[in-house]
């Protein structure tokens, strides 16, 4: 019987042999493939928004060398899907946004500010000079919306039925302090949270005989929203129940006075094949081609939960979509703050806010003069100008033309012109590796870069409640060493 031994052998990994790859230029991509490729590249590198058609074609060919792709093909595809590369014809909807005068703002909130109207709509200005760091105003949420994602934990008595906070005491503690429901498993963490949950009996107890609301069908609507990550419709339902079931005219008036636009319009701005969905800063994940069908089904469940609302409030499907769009336009961290919703945007804001639960504090970022407009940034001010403007266009319907945006656009155009004048000949092969990546990718290499170069880099592990954020390293190599048995 022969003896065997082990030897080390280096073998290729990650499909390094591409002999079976399609010949260059042999595949004509479909419109969907072109659109998806452009959308992905646009998300990764927003500065390409002002690139020419030939540059886009070169970038797409570099990523998909097997494609037979013409400029005309790219133009036709993007025009068909209402997507413009040049930025000249990008869809905006700010002129479709409407609002009304808020009927019941609390006087203490208006001590340092006052509401004004301009071509931009409602706004806030300072009544008197404000010092840097001064508290401008503070307010609670218009009507606190329980977190939809905590509904299962609430049902299991593991989280507060109002704010969703994890419950730390045993059940006996809550029973003794009258913080439990007599008819279901819901528990509240404090008496304040119990008092906030004014519609609990109507929405959570199937035995309720209220003609205006079917608790059993509300629970179906709630589950539907949870399954489809449709937080805005759920929030509209909670808000509507609060003023509808209690005839709360003040709450109704304040909610209906907020700026609104149909969610159908916002979906159009988000580009129906998902290029804009990645930028949607609302609370939903529903910006896709199947959204309308989901909306119709959800509206049907909403009407089942409130059988008289359609006639009593003329709440047809289009009005329901305007309510959903209203919530997405005005929400901050899943809540509505009345005075904060009056603030207009600036990429160089003069105020900022801090959240404490469902309470918000607004401070002066710098010294503010009397009668000066108060502005806040709707997006991350550290983002690149192209990314900021795209987020604003998709989520709030306008292309920002503030002084900062104009300066940065002008500088980019000058830099681009200077680069073009000093560049001769074809793009080098390392073009894609040396381009500045957008802030979305945080300058991390692509998967293809890793497989080709075997570089080591840090990847982020999502943080979990109660745990500090961690980092880990991962290495990709094109070859590995394996042990092979050799018989002698």
UniProtKB/Swiss-Prot annotation:
Histone methyltransferase that monomethylates 'Lys-5', 'Lys-8' and 'Lys-12' of histone H4 (H4K5me1, H4K8me1 and H4K12me1, respectively), thereby controlling gene expression and remodeling chromatin structures. It comes from the Eukaryota. GO terms for biological process: methylation; telomere maintenance. It is found in: Nucleus; Chromosome; Cytoplasm. PROSITE patterns: SET. Its main location: nucleus. Belongs to the class V-like SAM-binding methyltransferase superfamily. Histone-lysine methyltransferase family. SET5 subfamily. This is Histone-lysine N-methyltransferase SET5. InterPro entries: SET_dom (IPR001214), SET_dom_sf (IPR046341). One of its GO terms (molecular function) is S-adenosylmethionine-dependent methyltransferase activity. Its EC number is 2.1.1.-. GO terms for cellular component: chromatin; cytoplasm; nucleus. Residues 415-445 are annotated as: Disordered. It catalyses: L-lysyl-[histone] + S-adenosyl-L-methionine = N(6)-methyl-L-lysyl-[histone] + S-adenosyl-L-homocysteine + H(+). SUPFAM superfamilies: SET domain. It is an enzyme of class 2 (transferase). Gene3D superfamilies: 1.10.220.160, 6.10.140.2220, SET domain. Residues 111-379 form the SET domain. Keywords: Chromosome, Cytoplasm, Methyltransferase, Nucleus, S-adenosyl-L-methionine, Transferase. Pfam families: SET (PF00856).
């Amino acid at each position: 019987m022969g003896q065997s031994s082990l030897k080390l052998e280096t073998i290729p990994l990650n499909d390094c042999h591409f002999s079976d790859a399609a010949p260059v230029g042999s595949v004509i991509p479909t419109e969907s493939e072109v659109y998806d490729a452009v959308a992905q590249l646009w998300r990764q590198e927003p500065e390409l928004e002002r690139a020419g058609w030939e540059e886009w074609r070169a970038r797409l060919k570099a990523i998909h060398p097997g494609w037979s792709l013409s400029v005309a093909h790219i133009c036709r595809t993007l025009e068909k899907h209402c997507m413009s590369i040049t930025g000249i014809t990008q869809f905006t909807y700010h002129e479709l946004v409407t609002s009304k005068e808020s009927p019941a703002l609390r006087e203490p909130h208006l001590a340092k500010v006052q509401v004004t109207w301009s071509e931009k709509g409602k706004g806030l200005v300072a009544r008197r000079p404000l010092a840097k760091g001064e508290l401008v105003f503070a307010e609670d949420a218009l009507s606190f919306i329980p977190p939809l994602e905590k509904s299962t934990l609430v049902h299991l008595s593991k989280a507060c039925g109002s704010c969703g906070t994890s419950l730390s005491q045993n059940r006996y503690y809550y029973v003794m302090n009258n913080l439990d429901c007599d008819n279901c498993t819901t528990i509240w963490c404090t008496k304040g949270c119990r008092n906030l949950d004014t519609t609990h009996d109507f929405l959570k107890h199937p035995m309720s005989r209220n003609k205006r609301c079917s608790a059993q069908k509300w629970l179906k609507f709630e589950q539907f929203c949870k399954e489809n990550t449709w937080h805005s419709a759920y929030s509209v339902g909670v808000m509507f129940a609060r003023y509808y079931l209690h005839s709360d005219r003040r709450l109704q008036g304040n909610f209906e006075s907020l700026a609104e636009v149909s969610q159908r319009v916002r979906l159009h701005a988000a580009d129906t094949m998902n290029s804009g969905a990645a930028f949607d800063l609302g609370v939903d994940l529903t910006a896709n081609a199947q959204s309308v069908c989901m909306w119709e089904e959800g509206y049907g469940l909403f009407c089942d939960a409130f059988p008289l609302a359609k006639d009593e409030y003329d709440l047809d499907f289009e009005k329901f979509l305007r309510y959903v769009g209203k919530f997405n336009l005005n929400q901050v961290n899943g809540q509505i703050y009345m005075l904060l919703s009056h603030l207009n945007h600036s990429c160089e804001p003069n105020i900022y806010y801090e959240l404490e639960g469902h309470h918000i504090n607004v401070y002066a970022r710098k010294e503010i003069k009397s009668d000066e407009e108060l502005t806040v940034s709707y997006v991350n001010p550290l983002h690149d100008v192209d990314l900021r403007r795209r987020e604003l266009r998709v989520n709030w319907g306008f292309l920002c033309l503030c002084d900062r945006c104009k300066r940065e656009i002008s500088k980019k155009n000058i830099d681009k012109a200077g680069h073009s004048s000093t560049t001769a000949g074809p793009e080098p092969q390392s073009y894609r590796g040396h381009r500045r990546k957008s802030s979305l990718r945080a300058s991390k290499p692509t998967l293809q870069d890793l497989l080709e170069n075997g570089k080591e880099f840090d990847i982020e592990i999502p943080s979990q409640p109660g745990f500090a954020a961690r980092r880990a390293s991962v290495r990709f190599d094109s070859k590995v060493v394996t042990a092979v048995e050799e018989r002698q």
